[in-house]
Amino acid sequence: QKINCMRASGRAVFDGKEYVFHPETDFGTLDWGRGVWTYDNRWYWGSGNGVVNGKPFGFNIGYGFGDTSAASENMLFYDGVCHKLDDITFHIDKRDYMKPWTFTSTDGRFEMDFVPVLDRAAKIDVKLIVTDQHQVFGRMSGKAVLDDGTVLEIKDLMCFAEDVHNKY
């Protein structure tokens, strides 16, 4: 289960600097899952939240994990309403995850450019257990189209997208 646009409040102190979160402008995403996974699996996932045109906006996109023939996790969230998207494709230069990415949807309703700022990469290979992860944080810009045809212009929305391959 993934929940977007969860209002955040509070503060965090890192390296002597205080960061304050305001519920009007700051949001979090909850990612919670359970189940039985295959030994060898790969998924692509991205999520982000912010304010667009003065209203809460979020998205959840992904594929590669599980059977999505009946349903997928691709959604827009705008002003408290969910908007279903068709299939999304992540276009990534896997030789360099810090190069810009693009995202396209089969229905044309999620067309974005992504400029990475940080690749939280991890790779472990102990033969029986393998993980190769690139959780990349950056800025998303482009267009998102709501169910009623309203086009939202997205500019520099901080978010993340990941490419994860596990064997365990």
Question: Where are the regions a protein language model picked out?
Answer:
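Structured soluble/peripheral alpha/beta segments that form catalytic or ligand/cofactor-binding pockets
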Residues: Q1-Y168
